Amino acid sequence: MELGCPELLEPPEDIFSTGSFLELGFNGPASKVPVTRGLQKSEPDDFLNLFIDPNMIHCSETSPGRDSGVSEDPGSPAQQASSSPALYEVVYDSGTLQGTQREAGPTFGLISIQIDQWTPALMVPDACTVSGLPSDSHRHILPRVSTRAPAPPAAMPSCQHHLFLTDEEKQLLAQEGITLPSHLPLTKAEERILKKIRRKIRNKQSAQDSRRRKKEYLDGLESRVAACSEQNQKLQRKVQELERQNIFLMEQVRQLQKLTAQTSSRAAQTSTCVLILLFSLALIILPSFSPFQGQSEARPEDYQLHGVISRNILTHENVTENLESPVLKSKLEELPEAPTTNGSTKTHLKMRVKARPPGQIRGMVHTDEM
């Protein structure tokens, strides 16, 4: 492509005219554009080099009060754009300018051209596309025909947002045979599919978590069961040992009971024997200690018989005859020989019997026998 024709340096009137800008929704530029003043036909090396950077192409909506061109007329009406047409920034080399701009070094400028339905492939070949601008310390920027500030990040369209999918989401989409675009926005059907896939992934993760927790719980239970079984075995062995010790102690207790029974029976026998001996000794020794032993024996003369209330026993006539019998006589003779304290009384009675009648003798004998 030969860029030596000077006609390419002058923009056509139908594109940069005020009417065309008003139709596109922008304020028209001034009648005299400073870009057109300037290039010599004798300098073919400084012709316009057209570079279009795809990274500088962006979509934005025109604000209601923003001017699309450099206009000195304050009374020009501001119109709102009904749509968001594409805005392309063209980088050109203006070369050495005549008149007031005769400094050394080339100058560069930017022209913002709004194209409604043109495509970059029809405008500029791929060979003219570069990713950067040449750097130069002596650079002069020409006034723009149309200046436009870049849109803020919030106003940037969603076409620049990429859709990031995880490997698991990609795998599930591939299994279901569904392909999603890599850029946003998505349609409602695609959003539903993506939500469904993510819901499946969440359910899968929750199921895995529940299975993991269940496995951990079961492992903990198994370890506790093993520890409890081991402790139970130890306790069983200890119980068996204690049972053996208990049996041994019971045998010893039985033997001790037998020994204590024998010793207790022997002790009871000895104690009873000792008590019997003491009681017999007491019976033998106590009668010798009489309270009347220290007194003098009573004489027959000192003893006086007093009247005693006694029973009157009926006697038979044969009793008087029995008194004369030798048996009674022998008894009466034996009375003085008895070693008793009342021997004197019996002797006195015997002495008095002879002087009394037979009836009185029978009464005295009866009282003596009583």
Curated annotation (Swiss-Prot):
Stated consequence of mutating R311A: Abolishes cleavage by SP1
Molecular function via GO: DNA binding; DNA-binding transcription activator activity, RNA polymerase II-specific; RNA polymerase II transcription regulatory region sequence-specific DNA binding
A Pfam family recorded for this sequence: bZIP_1
Tissue expression: Predominantly expressed at high levels in testis with isoform 2 being the predominant isoform. Specifically expressed in postmeiotic spermatids and accumulates in the mid/late stage (at protein level). Ubiquitously expressed at low levels.
Residues exposed to the Lumenal side: 293-370
InterPro entries to which the protein is assigned, alphabetical: bZIP, bZIP_sf, CREB_ATF_subfamily
Glycan attachment positions: N318, N342
Full protein name: Cyclic AMP-responsive element-binding protein 3-like protein 4
Location relative to the cell: Endoplasmic reticulum membrane; Cytoplasmic vesicle, Secretory vesicle, Acrosome inner membrane
Region (Required for transcriptional activation): 1-55
An annotated GO cellular component: inner acrosomal membrane
Ranges per topology, Cytoplasmic: 1-271
PTM summary: Controlled by regulated intramembrane proteolysis (RIP). Following ER stress a fragment containing the cytoplasmic transcription factor domain is released by proteolysis. The cleavage seems to be performed sequentially by site-1 and site-2 proteases (PS1 and PS2). PS1 cleavage may be suppressed by a determinant in the C-terminal region.
GO BP of this protein: cell differentiation; positive regulation of transcription by RNA polymerase II; response to unfolded protein; spermatogenesis
Region span, Leucine-zipper: 235-256
KW Transcription (keyword) present: yes
Organism per entry: Mus musculus (Mouse)
Stretches that traverse the bilayer: 272-292
